[in-house]
């Protein structure tokens, strides 16, 4: 379950930001999950709640936003949206794609008191 380590990293980022800005409590966090990140939302929510325990983010609302993946098609020279790793280009049906975005988990925003 790599969701746990991803959430640990996210909470470390949140903690650092809270310390830098003298924040005592985080009330909400927005995570952006790429379509190709291979994470389960329920596992992220469960893991996030566990790793937030005892931190400034304990009890905060977690908002998850999904980001479509984008890839460069070497056959038609276009940036295209894809939804799985072994996808074909939706424009030319070529199979030579380079994934550019959509395979990560990012802390997009933090709401504080």
Swiss-Prot record:
Result after altering residue 3 to Q: Does not affect activity
The secretion signal range is none
Between which residues do disulfide bridges form? none
Presence of the UniProt keyword Zinc in the record: yes
* Top-level division of the source organism's lineage: Bacteria
Matches recorded under PROSITE patterns: HYPA (PS01249)
GO molecular function annotation? metallochaperone activity; nickel cation binding; zinc ion binding
A matching Pfam family: HypA
InterPro entries, per the entry: HybF, Hydgase_Ni_incorp_HypA/HybF_CS, HypA/HybF
Consequence when changing residue 2 to Q: Loss of activity. Does not affect the amount of zinc, but shows a strong decrease in nickel content
- GO term, biological process aspect, one: protein modification process
What phenotype has been reported when the gene encoding this protein is knocked out? Answer: Deletion of the gene severely reduces hydrogenase 1 and hydrogenase 2 activity. HypA-hybF double mutant is completely blocked in maturation of hydrogenases 1, 2 and 3. However, the inclusion of high nickel concentrations in the medium can restore limited activity of all three hydrogenases.
Q: Which residues bind Ni(2+)?
A: 2-3
**Consequence the record notes for mutating residue 92 to A:** Affects stability and solubility of the protein, but mutant is still active
Q: Which residues of this UniProt protein bind Zn(2+)?
A: 73, 76, 89, 92
Q: What is the effect of changing residue 76 to A?
A: Affects stability and solubility of the protein, but mutant is still active
Q: Which family does it belong to?
A: Belongs to the HypA/HybF family. HybF subfamily.
NCBIfam families, per the entry: hypA (TIGR00100), PRK03681.1 (NF002979), PRK12380.1 (NF009046)
Q: How does it assemble?
A: Monomer.
Q: What is this protein called?
A: Hydrogenase maturation factor HybF
Look up and give the organism this protein is from: Escherichia coli (strain K12)
